[in-house]
UniProtKB/Swiss-Prot annotation:
PANTHER family: CHOLINE DEHYDROGENASE, MITOCHONDRIAL, GLUCOSE-METHANOL-CHOLINE GMC OXIDOREDUCTASE. It holds the Pfam family GMC_oxred_N. One of its GO terms (biological process) is glycine betaine biosynthetic process from choline. It comes from Burkholderia vietnamiensis (strain G4 / LMG 22486) (Burkholderia cepacia (strain R1808)). NCBIfam families: betA, PRK02106.1. Keywords: FAD, Flavoprotein, NAD, Oxidoreductase. Gene3D superfamilies: FAD/NAD(P)-binding domain, Glucose Oxidase, domain 3. This is Oxygen-dependent choline dehydrogenase. It comes from the Bacteria. FAD binds at residues 7-36. Involved in the biosynthesis of the osmoprotectant glycine betaine. Catalyzes the oxidation of choline to betaine aldehyde and betaine aldehyde to glycine betaine at the same rate. Signal peptide: none annotated.
Length: 566
């Protein structure tokens, strides 16, 4: 068994861990060990580097932990997919590359919780900007020299994108030029984490590329964290496995857990930090009975509303093997073409009811009819809207099954457990149909393939959701930040009741944000990195942002085609 000593040990080289490793080692007097259970992000592996290949990593286990939930009681007892990234970059290595920060009111809402006053949107915006290089340059909302490459939609994109955005506007919803700017609400182009050369902009590429040659950073791949070591109530190091070899590393200052919303509570529980009754079931010595570890688990659920496309403009031909070598060659040589896009180039956020204070439904538009993981492709030209609710009141949990670090935990999201979930999904399907029947899509829209035009009553819609809704791969909130009885960490990520231990990843969100989670997770890590280094927070932003204040969710009077009557 080998033992080394560092100032900081980071467990997990994902969206947050790579940020911390890079920022902490900017100080040459600080040493950092970065442990990652997966392997390197091989730059010649098209599965993780080509944006259009985003479905491939989810189909195997090289880059994907491939977790599965327990039977979900409100979803026909299905065991549902819960993919999480494995390798340098973590889930930023296998995600859909949609760069969505969340709504300003998400963070303002966090800040109303006791002790989280420094997490307002205006406190967070400087850290979003710090992390970002946007291809069209900086402004009050966007950065121009950060590690994460963000690309915007360009002229010449698939015509279905603009048609779907215009259809949303024709249905009476707002148009927004920037889903991460002044106004998230509405339909518009979607920013993506893709480099100017058409490669995936993971945090391994953006952050670790600038830090990995530093002598004060040691990166160890294929290193599975087994337990956090404690000296009394102080975290003193990490025991980890590298194949059959056991090793320990000591931390002079802190252990930073950045393993994600599934593995972070799993590691804490395995280390004796979690609900005491759960730990006793597995005869784990209790370091601290902390009841919130693994509780409050949240996710976004979504469904695919699919249509036949009457004109041959969809991406259907690109799914055929005989067309893929040409697509791959153009991407490899030039970084252009169909391979250089994730093809989520437009989307939107809406409120389904006037009394919703900020958007509760998200859309991703895709110019092909296929499941996110590449399965169940419709054998014709088609297009679809990914539609899902943003802040479900349902709560789940992550619970250790065994003390073996190779065993997956028990995961239950408890999807669709509340009446509001069902109301919002029914509203979302009906709103989507109103959007899709607008004139902008007349030349493209064929028959509705899923759920199908005959699926109309509440009962029929509920049956469809129960059988067909899938995860959007946004697990979060399982080690929540705050100061109530179920909080796990304080406003700087420090675990309550312990010293020298922080959790820094999407698990510390108190409530899930409105949209995709990679950008907020990077922001959280940037913000907490300053606190770890003893730096003053960046100055609060001074910008305006949209608040509905009771404005109608939809201007029905301006809709080109009025809602259908029942």
């Amino acid at each position: 068994m080998t033992t080394r000593e560092y100032d900081y040990i980071i467990c997990g080289a994902g969206s947050a861990g790579n940020v911390l490793a890079t920022r902490l080692t900017e100080d040459p007097n600080v040493t950092v060990l970065l442990l990652e259970a997966g392997g390197p992000d091989y730059r010649f592996d098209f599965r993780t580097q080509m944006p259009a290949a985003l479905a491939y990593p989810l189909q195997g286990r090289r880059y994907n932990w491939a977790y599965e939930t327990d039977p979900e009681p409100h979803m026909d007892n299905r065991r549902m997919e819960c993919g999480r990234g494995k390798g340098l970059g973590g889930s930023s290595l296998i995600n859909g590359m949609c760069y969505i920060r969340g709504n300003a009111l998400d963070y303002d809402n966090w800040s109303t919780h006791q002790g989280l006053e420094r997490w307002t949107y205006l406190d967070c915006l400087p850290y979003f900007r710090k992390a970002e290089t946007r291809d069209v340059g900086p402004n009050d909302y966007h950065g121009g020299d950060g590690p994460v490459s963000v690309t915007t939609s360009k002229p010449g994109a698939n015509p279905l994108f603009e048609a779907m955005v215009e259809a949303g506007v024709q249905a009476g919803y707002p148009r927004t030029d920037d889903l991460n700017g002044y106004q998230q609400e509405g339909f518009g182009p979607m920013d993506r984490t893709v480099t100017p050369k058409g490669r995936r902009a993971s945090t391994a590429r953006g952050y670790l590329d600038q830090a990995k040659t530093r002598p004060n950073l040691e990166i160890v791949t294929h290193a599975l964290a087994d337990r956090i070591l404690f000296d009394g109530k102080r975290a003193s190091g990490v025991a980890y496995l590298r194949g059959s070899e056991r090793a320990t590393a000591h931390a002079r200052r802190e252990v930073l857990v950045c393993s994600g919303a599934i593995a972070s509570p799993q590691l804490l529980q395995r280390s004796g930090v979690g609900p005491g009754a759960w730990l006793k079931e597995l005869d784990i010595p209790i370091v601290l009975d902390l009841p919130g570890v693994g509780q409050n688990l949240q996710d976004h659920l979504e469904m695919y509303i699919q249509y036949e496309c009457k004109e041959p403009v969809s991406l259907y031909p690109a799914l055929k093997w005989w067309n893929q070598p040409k697509i791959g060659l153009e991407w490899m040589l030039n970084g252009t073409g169909l391979g250089a896009s994730n093809h989520f180039e437009a989307g939107g956020f809406i409120r389904t009811r006037d009394d919703d204070p900020w958007p509760n439904i998200q859309y991703h538009f895709l110019p092909v009819a296929i499941n996110y993981n590449g399965s169940n492709a419709i054998e014709m030209h088609g297009f679809q809207a990914h539609v899902g609710s943003m802040r479900s009141p349902s709560r789940g949990r992550v619970k250790l099954r065994s003390r073996d670090p190779n065993d997956h935990p028990s995961i239950l999201f408890n999807y669709m457990a509340e009446a509001l979930d069902w109301r919002e999904f029914r509203d979302a399907i009906r709103a989507t149909r109103e959007i899709m029947r607008q004139p902008a899509l007349d030349r493209y829209r064929g028959r509705e393939l899923n759920p199908g035009a005959d699926c109309r009553s509440d009962k029929e819609l509920d049956t469809f959701v129960r059988a067909r809704a899938e995860t959007a791969f946004h697990p979060s909130c399982s080690c929540k930040m705050g100061y109530d009885d179920m909080a796990v960490v304080d406003d700087e990520g420090r675990v309550h009741g312990l010293d020298g231990l922080r959790v820094v990843d999407a698990s510390i969100m108190p409530i899930i944000t409105t949209g995709n989670l990679n950008a907020p997770t990077i922001m959280i890590a940037e913000k907490i990195a300053d606190r770890i280094r003893g730096r003053e927070p960046l100055a609060r932003a001074n910008v305006a942002y949209y608040v509905a204040n009771g404005a109608p969710a939809r201007n029905v009077a301006k809709a080109v085609r009025q809602p259908e009557t029942a």
